[in-house]
């Protein structure tokens, strides 16, 4: 096989994996999606997401780290110049994991999008933090958040 043929097969496999995950995504939580993160496509600001199912995942690089978002409202991204999942939370929901080994850097919730549920984790200031309560909008380690976050210390 030539390099071009191998590359074509790899692209075909990647597309098939992404479509398979997208078909199952509505039934998966953030932990399950992030476990299959390698199958999630990068957000494309020129793409028409209006035919995608609610819950379909994309990733975006936020502050140098990959963050996973799921579609809330199907739309054509090209109609919203400059929009990304991280700055259009009415259209995309930030996902989190309960797996400390796959914890993502803390990102501030916007409205209800991105709030941390019970046992979801994030990294912050070199530590892994676990949310003690659902609907957690607070920054880990901030004054007065002891009832909301546990420093796992990993």
Positions of the model-derived regions?
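Tryptophan-rich substrate-binding surfaces of secreted polymer-degrading and adhesive proteins
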Residues: 2-154
